[in-house]
Amino acid sequence: MASTERNFLLLSLVVSALSGLVHRSDAAEISFGSCTPQQSDERGQCVHITSCPYLANLLMVEPKTPAQRILLSKSQCGLDNRVEGLVNRILVCCPQSMRGNIMDSEPTPSTRDALQQGDVLPGNDVCGFLFADRIFGGTNTTLWEFPWMVLLQYKKLFSETYTFNCGGALLNSRYVLTAGHCLASRELDKSGAVLHSVRLGEWDTRTDPDCTTQMNGQRICAPKHIDIEVEKGIIHEMYAPNSVDQRNDIALVRLKRIVSYTDYVRPICLPTDGLVQNNFVDYGMDVAGWGLTENMQPSAIKLKITVNVWNLTSCQEKYSSFKVKLDDSQMCAGGQLGVDTCGGDSGGPLMVPISTGGRDVFYIAGVTSYGTKPCGLKGWPGVYTRTGAFIDWIKQKLEP
């Protein structure tokens, strides 16, 4: 049996022993050395689980998501056989800021998450982690993958017809990052469609709530999806919808109200520090969405693909035949036969996992801009707006 499975089995055995508040012994105040917590950059202490409310409360949650199970198992740092009771013996790596008295077992969004203002970007202790125009040749995601993915919902003028035409990524409690052409384009003008709302926490557009059956036969359902009306769209001032180059193809969508984070609704991280200037050449990245499949029909289920980033010079050589001139604010990825972003995935994130504080954190390296028609042509990568080139612009546009 794998170490992770053994650890979780041990933690599972104590669930039935937890009822209401966990009683702490004097030994629970002892630290067994420093450690690196699973979901925090700060240093942690190896302590009794009863001294770590964050993990003690999580232990009492049923049913647990796969990510919660993994977090619990990987957080265990030992056993203290000097004390009585299986619960009291478990040692976990707890971030210093999360130690203290045990709180109520009912899980609720943290105060920090619930009250975060629109001009505040979350740290990588909150954003970019998993509790998995255009996806072509993709595979299904799991129910919990990419919780920052959103659908942009459009309403036709003088009609009650709604459609999902673009994707995007949640940046914080109030803003979504998407492509400029998702807010201004000839196609939108012709169709008479206007951006109306944003859907969060979606996986399968045919069902609400979304449910999945695990290998052990247990059926788990996510909360119902959330539709929030748009307060305003902010298109980059230098974006020209009719330009063949499609530079500055980036936009922000401000929601009418703040959204609280959950396992199924969570922001992705913006590039920071050295990632801002990184062009990510030869990196493998993930793209996800509900766009057209190889059958040229929108996918009901969120799909994902893995693409490799091209050298910009090589990409320019491909697109020069279309008189396209790429610059450093753009990047290219993909080009594998039958694997591409496609109609409906525009505005979605190009995601790169970076090991941070002992876990993978997803950053939004790019925003889906455009590609070839038909999608998925061998040797033709898709073009993305490079997010790192617009960090200052994004921060300037955020409001409380």
Swiss-Prot record:
It comes from Drosophila melanogaster. CDD domains: Tryp_SPc. Ca(2+) binds at residues 202, 204, 207, 210. PROSITE patterns: CLIP, TRYPSIN_DOM, TRYPSIN_HIS, TRYPSIN_SER. The clip domain consists of 35-55 residues which are 'knitted' together usually by 3 conserved disulfide bonds forming a clip-like compact structure. Residues 34-94 form the Clip domain. Its EC number is 3.4.21.-. This is Spaetzle-processing enzyme.
